[in-house]
């Protein structure tokens, strides 16, 4: 009889993941206690804001509909400027609606979580031949388009992500925004950063998703239309 090995058990066979749990699971559980959240059966949602260089971790408890902010991690460093990633080597951190598609327990940057760039929107709007890729949230403090949060903090985030996936969450969503896209912000950013209409329209498109989550603390399913724009699924 073949014994089933859970995702968490498989991950814990890696020394760095085992170390992360030993060092950081108690810290992560304390975040839950401080926010009066249940550690069992939760789901995770990530939001990154490039201008302020912050990565938010939101939690949805089992049986609940709404997400609650658990913790915020600071980027350790950044690259590029505000605006989406459009080609290999542009140093840009992507902007858009993504999910974690890879857990790397033996990363060159300690531990890392892969972001599914290029996604369906990027496949339409980015360079067709060389859109770039290999975008990760990772340890260390160096980047050419990724989000580094230090070895110390990636341990915490990796534990959270492993727990969520082990709880049955197939895709951990991550929304990456240039800034907090409140009313008037896309227009002000477009002026301050002297971007072209393609970039400003991208920001206005993302604003609808940002504002909906801000108002409801729920994630609506999103699809991509033929123009590469995000839209709520009907």
Model-based region annotation:
Residues 1-144, 152-172, 181-234:
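Cell wall/extracellular polymer interaction/catalysis modules
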Residues 176-178:
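Hydrophobic transmembrane alpha-helices
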Residues 149:
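A conserved hydrophobic position in a structured secondary element of the catalytic/binding core
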């Amino acid at each position: 009889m073949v014994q089933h090995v859970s995702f968490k058990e498989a991950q814990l066979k890696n020394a760095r993941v085992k170390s992360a749990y030993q060092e950081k699971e108690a810290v992560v559980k304390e975040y839950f206690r401080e926010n009066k959240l249940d550690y069992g059966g939760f789901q995770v949602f990530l939001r990154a804001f490039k201008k302020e260089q912050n990565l938010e971790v939101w939690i949805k408890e089992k049986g609940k509909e709404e997400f609650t902010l658990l913790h915020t991690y600071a980027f350790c460093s950044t690259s590029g400027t505000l605006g989406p990633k459009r080609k290999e080597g542009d140093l840009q951190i992507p902007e858009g609606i993504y999910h974690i598609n890879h857990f790397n327990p033996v990363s060159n940057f300690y531990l890392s979580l892969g972001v599914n760039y290029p996604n369906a929107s990027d496949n339409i709007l980015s360079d067709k031949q060389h859109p770039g890729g290999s975008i990760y949230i990772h340890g260390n403090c160096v980047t050419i388009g990724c989000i580094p949060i230090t070895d110390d903090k990636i341990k915490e985030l990796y534990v959270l992500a492993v727990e969520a996936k082990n709880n049955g969450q197939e895709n951990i969503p991550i929304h990456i925004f240039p800034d907090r896209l409140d009313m008037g912000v896309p227009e002000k950013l477009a002026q301050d950063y002297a971007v072209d209409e393609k970039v400003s329209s991208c920001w206005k498109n993302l604003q609808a998703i940002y504002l909906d989550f801000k108002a409801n603390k729920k994630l609506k399913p999103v699809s991509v239309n033929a123009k590469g724009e995000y839209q709520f699924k009907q």
